[in-house]
Each structure stands twice: as structure tokens, then as C-alpha cells.
From Swiss-Prot:
One of its GO terms (biological process) is proteolysis. The lineage of its organism: Bacteria, Bacillati, Bacillota, Clostridia, Eubacteriales. It comes from the Bacteria. It comes from Clostridium perfringens (strain 13 / Type A). The chain crosses the membrane at residues 88-110, 262-284, 312-334. Zn(2+) binds at residues 17, 21. Residues 96-174 form the PDZ domain. This is Putative zinc metalloprotease CPE1693. It is an enzyme of class 3 (hydrolase).
Amino acid sequence: MYIIFALLAFSALILVHELGHFIVAKLNGIYVEEFAIGMGPKLFGVKVGETEYNLRILPFGGFVKMLGEEDESDDSRSLNAKTPIQRILVMGAGAFMNYVLALIIFIGLAMSSGFAENKVASVVPNSPAQEIGIEQGDEFLKIDGNKIHTTDDFRMGLALAKGNPVELEIKRGNDVLTKTVQPILNESGMYQVGISYALVEKPTLLQGIKQGFNETRSLVSQSFIALKTIVTGEANLKTDVGGPVTIIKMSGQAAKAGANTLLWFMAFLSVQLAVFNLLPFPALDGGRIFIELIQMIIRKEIPAKYIEAVNTVGFMLLMGLMVLVTIKDIIFPIL
């Protein structure tokens, strides 16, 4: 049952993403031939007006098929007949909608359940924090030069330091202090300094909106940091990288933990989906935007057949990567 909730939640993220492409395409007068949720063989579909809406067998992915997207067309309503700016807006709309969804969820969670802020509520006796003079009410501003917007930013900073001392910028009253602390591992294998955070139990609307923006911004930053560790080889592919199987398992666990946890995980996945899709890789939205930018710079249209060839190769590589990561999930499961 929880897996069903998880799949429905993930499908909702895809729906929102593709809806972004669909809405902006329609607003720009583009003929949308097909709106699909999922990949692979079609389960069922219905045609409303000029567009066919269908659901496909694999619950990962989706697409909006627009006239002129895969080949050249002389029709004034085709994608290739529109300006580069219009095409970029269409391609970027999916990721934008995922950001908006994450923001709305985080604001809702902050307003309904409260949140922890970057202020110290208490200091554990004989902890690293006490040793360097951290006091109740201190507010963390930076860790190793990186701004702290949420408590997750602080935890990420400790994790990235890998046990090495970190430099903290702290606000105490009207003063800004700089202190260096040596993190220690707790029983869960996570680095800590021995503090608890102050809780905002009944935030105002302004506080909730601010926290929503901070949470979204923090996740975007963490996503790029994670990508960097994968590219540079710092990440352990066995334990730090998960694919479809891991996502389903984690979604199921989130659903089992309750509505708030599932909503938070949905927002988390929504940000990951947005960041991933904006990477400048062929077949992804970011790759298509990159091509449009190149065409704007050289002031010349690249023949559609070449663009389609590049996107086809990119899609095949992505599918191959998904298969490999799925196999990895089965052989070396994270959960």
C-alpha cells in the first residue's frame, strides 16, 4: 500500500513537470500533439481537442510531444517556428514548476509543523560547542565560508569537512564572532558539535515563506554539491548513489512515516528532478536549452536532424545509465 502512495507521489512530480512544459507551450501558441505520464508502452489514452493525453506502463518519466520538436515543420504553430527565447521558456518551464511545487510544500510544512532555525537552544556539556564557548541564542551565519540558511546547511557543512575542524561565523547580539570547532561522530555516524536548535513552533506567514525559500535554496545547493562529489569521485557509488529502486524504497518508507514525511520527500525529489533536468546533457531540458543558447550565439539554426541525432544518443545513454544504476540498486542496495 505504501509503495502505491510512493508511486502516486512520484507520478505527481512528473505531472507537475510536464504540465509546466504544456502550459507554456500552449501560451506560446505551440501545437501539442501528446501529453504522456510514464514511459514505455501506452496503458490507455484519450484525445481532448488536438492533444492526446495518455498514461504509460513505467512510472518514471513523461513527455510533452510538440509539433516541430523532432523534425522541421513549416507550420506556424510548430516549436521550431518559434523564437529561441520562446523555446527556452518552454524547455525551462518543467523545472520551474518543480521548484514552485517544492517551495509550496516547504512553506506549507513550515506553517503547519514549525521548523528549527539556526539559533542555539542549548549546548551539550563537555561538547566541542561548549569547549569553544558557544552560547544559547547564538545564530550560525557561515560554516567554512559558506552561508547557512537552514539547519541542513550546517549539517552538510560538518559532513563535507569529514571530521576536520570547521570555521564558524556566529552572530551574538550585535557582534559577529569567528570560532573554530572540531566536530565529533555521534552514535549514528554523523558529525556533530553538541548543540540543539531553537524551534519556531508557530511561525508567521512571512517566516513560513522565508523558510520555504531557504529550504528550497538549501536543497538546490546540496544537489550541486552531491553532483560535484560524484563527478570528482569523492562519492562512494555503492553507498551514496541510488536509482529507481532506492527512490521507490525511500518513498515507501516516507509514506509509512506519515503525510508530513512523504510531503517533505516529494519536495526533495521535486528539487532533484528540476536540477537533473537542467543539466546541459543531450535529451534533457538543460541540453535543449544549451543548444538554443548556442544557436543564439552563432545566429544560425542547427539543422533539426543533427539536433535529433544528438538527443537520441543522449537519451540512449540516459536509459543505459538508468539500467546500470538499477542493477547497482539490486546488487548493492542502500536500504
